[in-house]
Amino acid sequence: MRIGLHVHIAGGYVKAVEHAKAVGCKAIQVFSTNPRTYRTSATDFAALDAFAQLRREAGIDPCAIHTPYLINLASTDAKIAQGSLRLLQADLAVAARGGMRFVNTHLGSYGTRDRTEGFTAICRALESALSKIEPDVFLVLENSAGAGNLAGGTIEELGALIRALDHPQLGVCLDTAHAWATGYEINSKEGVDRFVERADREIGVARILMFHFNDTQVPLGGSRDRHWHIGEGNIGFEGFRALLAHPELRDKTAILETPGNDEDDLRNMQTILAIEKGAVSC
């Protein structure tokens, strides 16, 4: 797998790439803008070009953009729905300009809306975004932790979206903490095998483009989005070892979104790389 971190760019692209390289990243994920606003900022083309060059020099590829948290493609509020689509389209444009392969997005919440109507609204929004997607960029739908009426919590629902849209540049990101919170028992080889088999059946393993590797202290099926340090939660060493060793997943990208500071980033990267190399026992 190409393993890396979500890195912050508030200190500039140079520092972000330096940090990623220092902790052993082969891939990275970033926010292109403030993740907690519907406002989009003007694109700094020179900075994007410099960022791409820095990544090439560091051997870091692919790069993913994570869209803002506020996106809700199922909303009945026209301002929210339209603002969400604008954010998604903006990140797809930035990715194309900056040589970033993936744009990873949450889908939002159905709220009190009929789920069939909400599903149709999500499909329409994604169809609109995909109609303008540039070559070499992939739109990646992330599974939710299953809380409340969040969209995309199950493998079956993600698969239904993939089939409904049937677009070659549409894929899926599977977050391990979210999967566990939804009830997928991925803390053993047997559990991971069942999970991957189910995902292949419903989504197609070729459509699984990314993973978010996060441990969690949430109980199985707890429906809460809480990330924790690799190997220190309920998924544990055995779960991540099984994911890393699975033959169908070896060409995938895995991004850590673990909590903490730069020292925690280094510790989590060292742990996941040691698991990959077989240096950590279960």
Residue spans for each PLM region:
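C-terminal helical cap(s) of enzyme catalytic domains, especially alpha/beta-barrels
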Residues: D262-S281
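Active-site beta-loop-alpha junctions enriched in small/polar residues
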Residues: H6-A10, F31-P35, P68-L70, G108-Y110, ...
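Aromatic/hydrophobic pocket-lining residues that form the small-molecule binding cavity
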Residues: Y13, L48, S84, L88, ...
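Conserved, mostly hydrophobic/aromatic
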Residues: A20, H66, S84, A95, ...
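Acidic (Asp/Glu)-rich catalytic clusters
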Residues: E18-C25, D44-A64, Q89-G99, E127-D136, ...
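Active-site acidic/histidine proton-transfer and metal-coordination neighborhood
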Residues: R56-E57, L73-G171
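Acidic/histidine-rich catalytic cores of soluble enzymes
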Residues: C123-W228
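N-terminal pre-domain/capping segments
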Residues: M1-T67, I71-A90, G278-C282
